[in-house]
Amino acid sequence: MVLETERLILREYTWQDFDALYALLSDPVTMQHYPKPYDEAGTKRWIDWSLQNYQKYGFGWWAMVLKETGEFIGDCGITMQRIDGQLLPEIGYHIDKAYWRQGYGKEAAKAVRDWAFTHTKLDALYSYMTAGNVASYSTAAAAGLKKVKEYEDPEDGPLYVYAITRVEWKELQVSEGEQGLF
């Protein structure tokens, strides 16, 4: 599975990505909206879970690399997440702090959104984040998702849920003048 955008390649994880992913997930600034940064065991579980998801669902976290250099700068993809008690397909993204505020999250999230609605039968996509994660909900909104819910999680505190339906995505394709595969 490979997705290409103007500046990025999104591809399935391999075990060769461990060191770069560990550097990303263990960074306290990058992971400030998680309960804690990941250790080596958590990073191994991240890759293993991604590999399992590719087999089970046909999607998962995808490594994000710069098209020009091949440098790993984060990940973006779809995972099944428990959101306020429901198992839902979530678009998520994690970007190395050196690449924040350059539009990579938006670019990747839009590509993953378009891939999901053209290659799966999913009726909606979700994104959820802590209420203080402005970058995450800004990225979700830039990808066409709208805030649909707020709820209190016992471990993470207040969370926001953003979503886009297949119908809304089709309307967005028309309004953006894009040629989507309907």
Region locations from a protein language model:
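Conserved GNAT-fold acetyl-CoA-binding loop/helix
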Residues: V29-W49
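A short helix-loop-beta-strand connector motif used in the catalytic cores of GNAT acetyltransferases and
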Residues: S50-A63
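Secondary-structure boundary/capping residues
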Residues: T30, D39, K56-F59, L125
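Acyl-donor (CoA/ACP) binding surface of acyl/acetyltransferases
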Residues: M1-Q32, V65-F182
